[in-house]
Amino acid sequence: MAISFMNHGKPTPNGNLLIVDGLNLAFRWKHQNKLDFEHDYVRTVESLAKSYNCGEIVVLGDGGSDYRKTIDPDYKANRAERYKDQTPEEEAEFLEFLQEFGVTMKNLKSKGYLTIKYKGVEADDIAAVIATNREELGLEDIWLISSDKDWDLLINENVSRFSTVTRKETTLDNWDEHYDFDPEYYLTFKCLTGDKGDNVPGVTGIGPKRATQLIGQYGDVFDIMNTLPIESRYKFMQNLNEFGSDRLATNVELMDLTYDVDAAVLGHSQDILRLVENYVSKN
């Protein structure tokens, strides 16, 4: 579906929901060294809602990663390392960026859009609560706006994703244009290959191609865990044996957005559903 950023303005309520990965979208302007982006941000969100025929908009904030850090203290530990060598000017610029994002979120809320953020909770998990309760909330279709492929774990017949970075859609219908396995194996793929951005280790020597081959041969991550150890002369298979079922199980907990949604949002799931239900019914 073509996107037109000229078609801005408040959308008409219709039961379709746009869920925006708030900080993820804001980085679009950060990468352009543009720190005065409030107007452009709101305009873009409204344009996307119109383009995807979404009558309701929810923008999610990130409040931390408490749940996953209790599972693995090294989760996202590389983020601090990434910023430790910032100059004072870079630190000030980043603070200004975060302040502008805060102002933008307040502006979105003042315009009547729903914004949700909890201390210690990732935006991914708030999105998961909403997406997995789509029918109960009386929603038709959901469009996820994020460049984060982790959100593809939520894709189904009624939930799709658009990346403003690649400008590509990922839907159930075009899934095979992006991946060489069925959607139900995406979690397995991630558990095997890991996630460098989140500091989640994968199996050494297993990249996308080998992960896809293992899925075809053994099935999902639980099938693989039950099959280990696997006798093989290949080094990457020996690495998989050493990686072990326990680490694969940890990766499942870290990466599966639907594993325990209430725990992941620190018990806020009912509050999230109440906020969305009230917002949708009010519109």
Language-model-derived ranges and their functions:
Residues E157, D176, T204:
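Conserved, surface-exposed functional patches that form binding/active-site neighborhoods
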Residues E277-N283:
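Long, highly charged low-complexity segments enriched in Glu/Asp and Lys/Arg with interspersed Ser/Thr
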Residues A2-D141, L153-E169, A249-T250, D256-D262, ...:
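Noncatalytic, basic helical substrate-engagement surface that gates or grips nucleic-acid strands
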Residues R167-G197:
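A short, charged helix-loop
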